[in-house]
């Protein structure tokens, strides 16, 4: 497997920052009340990861190891401030909805972790790809959890999508369940923990099935080879 494919596989599934490393749980649980909020924060985090990894990788040869962490934090804070201003300018409704969790991306362990563990040791292109893969992995986990909570809590999907995509996105709203009253458990923090637990369990089941399938394939290949050898004799 090439390095690029390995980075994508690690970021999106095998080493998913939310479902495997369990990093950034504070925004994951707090913002994932709707699919729109989850998608907005996930995309913002992905953009920060890509830009931060690129900058750290480009400057890695000139940053003294003794002061690298403060410099990384300064880079991350600069990128997050820029992203925050962009969201404020072009998606003000989403900016109000996400609130403090946009600037809190600075303290997200995913961002500083990838800068230190990968970007500081690898070329710019691969570092940017690593940031993209890790960000999209976190975004997918956020979106699935947000969609699950929104459907169970309000019976809708993509409610408030216009805050992220503009006024045309109001047509994306889907009424899936017709609830007389909202299911508050799904919308409150306990529902977020339960939903995350279900996602973790689902990933574990899928991983175990994939391992079993690979094991069966490895066992069947030698048997076929032995059968051909017996026929040849």
UniProtKB/Swiss-Prot annotation:
<dbReference type="GO" id="GO:0005886">
    <property type="term" value="C:plasma membrane"/>
</dbReference>
<feature type="transmembrane region" description="Helical">
    <location>
        <begin position="128"/>
        <end position="148"/>
    </location>
</feature>
<comment type="subunit">
    <text>The complex is composed of six subunits: RnfA, RnfB, RnfC, RnfD, RnfE and RnfG.</text>
</comment>
<comment type="similarity">
    <text>Belongs to the NqrDE/RnfAE family.</text>
</comment>
<feature type="transmembrane region" description="Helical">
    <location>
        <begin position="92"/>
        <end position="112"/>
    </location>
</feature>
<dbReference type="InterPro" id="IPR003667">
    <property type="entry name" value="NqrDE/RnfAE"/>
</dbReference>
<keyword id="KW-0472">Membrane</keyword>
<feature type="transmembrane region" description="Helical">
    <location>
        <begin position="39"/>
        <end position="59"/>
    </location>
</feature>
<keyword id="KW-0249">Electron transport</keyword>
<keyword id="KW-1278">Translocase</keyword>
<dbReference type="GO" id="GO:0022900">
    <property type="term" value="P:electron transport chain"/>
</dbReference>
<dbReference type="Pfam" id="PF02508">
    <property type="entry name" value="Rnf-Nqr"/>
</dbReference>
<feature type="transmembrane region" description="Helical">
    <location>
        <begin position="18"/>
        <end position="38"/>
    </location>
</feature>
<feature type="transmembrane region" description="Helical">
    <location>
        <begin position="182"/>
        <end position="202"/>
    </location>
</feature>
<feature type="transmembrane region" description="Helical">
    <location>
        <begin position="69"/>
        <end position="89"/>
    </location>
</feature>
<keyword id="KW-1003">Cell membrane</keyword>
<keyword id="KW-0812">Transmembrane</keyword>
<protein>
    <recommendedName>
        <fullName>Ion-translocating oxidoreductase complex subunit E</fullName>
        <ecNumber>7.-.-.-</ecNumber>
    </recommendedName>
</protein>
<keyword id="KW-0997">Cell inner membrane</keyword>
<keyword id="KW-1133">Transmembrane helix</keyword>
<comment type="function">
    <text>Part of a membrane-bound complex that couples electron transfer with translocation of ions across the membrane.</text>
</comment>
<keyword id="KW-0813">Transport</keyword>
<dbReference type="InterPro" id="IPR010968">
    <property type="entry name" value="RnfE"/>
</dbReference>
């Amino acid at each position: 497997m090439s390095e690029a494919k390995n980075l994508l596989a690690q970021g999106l599934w095998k080493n998913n920052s939310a479902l495997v490393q369990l990093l950034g749980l504070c925004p994951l649980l707090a913002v994932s009340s709707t699919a729109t909020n989850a998608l907005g924060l996930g995309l913002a985090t992905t953009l920060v990861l890509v830009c931060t990894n690129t900058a750290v990788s480009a400057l890695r040869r000139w940053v003294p190891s003794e002061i690298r962490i403060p410099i990384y934090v300064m880079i991350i804070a600069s990128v997050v401030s820029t992203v925050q201003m962009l969201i404020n300018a072009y998606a003000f409704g989403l900016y109000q909805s996400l609130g403090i969790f946009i600037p809190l991306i600075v303290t997200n362990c995913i961002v500083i972790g990838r800068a230190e563990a990968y970007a500081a040791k690898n070329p710019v292109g691969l570092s940017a790809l690593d940031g993209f893969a890790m960000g999209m992995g976190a975004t997918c986990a956020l979106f699935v959890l947000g969609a699950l909570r929104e459907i169970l809590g309000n019976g809708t999907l993509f409610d408030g999508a216009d805050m992220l995509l503009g006024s045309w996105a109001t047509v994306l709203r889907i009424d899936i369940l017709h609830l007389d009253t909202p299911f508050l458990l799904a919308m409150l923090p306990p529902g977020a923990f339960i939903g995350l637990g279900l996602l973790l369990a689902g990933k574990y089941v899928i991983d175990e099935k994939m391992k079993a399938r690979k094991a069966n394939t490895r066992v069947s290949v030698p048997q076929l080879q032995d059968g051909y050898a017996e026929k040849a004799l």
